[in-house]
Amino acid sequence: MLSRLLIVPLIFALAGLAISAPVNDGTEADNDERAASLLVHLKGDKDGGGLTGSPDGVSAGTTDGTDSSKELAGGAVDSSPDTTDTPDASSSDIFPDTNNRDTSVETTGNPDDSDAPDAAESAGSQDTTDAADASEAVAETVDTYDIPDTDGADDREKVSTEVSTEDLDSAGVDKSPESDSTESPGSDSAESPGSDSAESPGSDSTESPGSDSTESPRSDSTDEVLTDVQADSADVTSDDMDEATETDKDDDKSDDKSDADAATDKDDSDEDKDTELDGKAHAEDTQTEEAADSDSKQGAADSDSDTDDDRPEKDVKNDSDDSKDTTEDDKPDKDDKKNRDSADNSNDDSDEMIQVPREELEQQEINLKEGGVIGSQEETVASDMEEGSDVGDQKPGPEDSIEEGSPVGRQDFKHPQDSEEEELEKEAKKEKELEEAEEERTLKTIESDSQEDSVDESEAEPDSNSKKDIGTSDAPEPQEDDSEEDTDDSMMKEPKDSDDAESDKDDKDKNDMDKEDMDKDDMDKDDMDKDDMDKDDVDKDASDSVDDQSESDAEPGADSHTVVDEIDGEETMTPDSEEIMKSGEMDSVVEATEVPADILDQPDQQDDMTQGASQAADAAATALAAQS
């Protein structure tokens, strides 16, 4: 409403300025000149021949232009001959000069209503009602700013252009000083009603009462001047009002557009709120699912791991999961701080926030379908420990931390649809590993039985073959078992992708290390039994060697020497390395075969060896007791 209240006085101000401006100023003058030149070019062939018989070849002026202008002005048609044209040209030439900005200020003011009749009387004192009618029309247009019809305005424009062309055609006619003196007051009296007191006496003094020739040009010139002023003012006012109506329409359109924009902004803000709330709800749901999954995984991992080496890595991963949750919690807060006008940005942010967990869920579903074996490893280990299998007796190796910690970070997202499939896979995996554990037990019992049998045979028949069996029975058999176990694992578990291959490799390494630990325990036990038996044998041999030196041969001596070498080899062994143990045993066997028989036949040398063997056996027994 405020804009409309301001536009109405602005329209009147612009209309007043347009009326007061010079008629031939700016682009309008250029357009009038172009139109006039075009009409001259088109009508020059017809009018140039002097149709009225004038000697100069100029139109006489009694054309339809002047008659139509008089008819539009409301006056009677004056069919006076040639005397109407010469003042016509002078009046058209004088009119732009006299219509300056000083006189325009007077015309745009508030003229008295009595001035217009005075001007009509001063013009009608020479003869006519045409001047009075024209002056009244001009006074009405100046006072009331009446808006004429568009059709009438177009007709007046045509009339004014025709009059201007005729004026240009008659511009070459000489002007008399009398006509100039009589026209300038008339034109002034027609334009500025306020100057009637000064103009009317001058016009009366210059008139000759008896001459009709001066009256008719004067009256005609005033009629034409008034019609020109009326047509021009009507054109200007019609143009101004057209512009005003167009500006009103534009303002209405802009108001409607602003209202529509405000409505769309409101709708966008509501949509932004809805999307942000949906994004928050979805993010909170995903966070709760992630927290539940991470808690369940963390509990399973804590039950599986007995060492302190695994806990820092799990704590770090749990911290990383918590940091992810906090960053996802911060995203909606940042979106809330954004301006509501930026609807596209808020929508894009909310879409990205919603799309991220969906993509991760899809990726996790693919990973679970392709590599379901990875997720069931730690749970199978936990079930084996609960059922009391020999896996619980094994010592945890350095690969346990990697194996147990690896699936925790990968399987934060679990889709509820795959839970049944995972349970079936877990049960199948448990059955497979139980079968493997039973096979390992049977193999280990067979190994222990074979080792005991070999020890008994070595005691009953002490020869080189039995010594080789004692020295080598522990080493190659676990290698064969490992190869068989590896083939079984390779047959049972075919890797589907790189993750499955790595998990299988970790399982194999773990099984190998568990077997090595079991083998070391069995070998330590066997060595202790051997040490006790060797002590008895050494004492018995020492007592028998004094009485029966001749009965001893190379093989019992080699047996005692191998005992010394084996005990020395055991002193150099470390319980964490199997290769050094095997190499020590092999070296003892080689050294036993390389001892010359003549050295062992000497009694002094044999006594020294038996004493050294007894001392070494005592040292080895104390060392093994300390280690156990």
Curated annotation (Swiss-Prot):
Q: Which UniProt keywords apply?
A: Extracellular matrix, Glycoprotein, Secreted, Signal
Regions of compositional bias (Basic and acidic residues) in chain numbering = 246-266, 276-285, 311-343
Q: Where is the signal peptide?
A: 1-20
Look up keyword Signal and say if it applies.
Answer: yes
Tissue localization of expression is: Specifically expressed in otolith matrix-producing cells.
Q: Which residues form a coiled coil?
A: none
Q: Which GO terms describe its cellular component?
A: extracellular region
Enumerate composition-biased segments (Low complexity).
Answer: 78-93, 613-628
**Predominant place of localization:** secreted
Q: Where is the composition biased (Acidic residues)?
A: 449-462, 477-489, 514-536, 544-556, 565-578
Where is there biased composition of kind Polar residues?
Answer: 182-214
State which residues carry a glycan (glycosylated).
Answer: 318
Location of this chain's protein in the cell: Secreted, Extracellular space, Extracellular matrix
Stretch list, region Disordered: 43-628
Q: Which top-rank group of organisms is this from?
A: Eukaryota
Q: What is known of its domains?
A: The Asp/Glu-rich (acidic) region mediates binding to calcium.
Primary role = Calcium-binding component of otoliths, a calcium carbonate structure of the inner ear involved in hearing and balance sensing. Binds calcium.
Give the protein's recorded name. Otolith matrix protein OMM-64
- Native species: Oncorhynchus mykiss
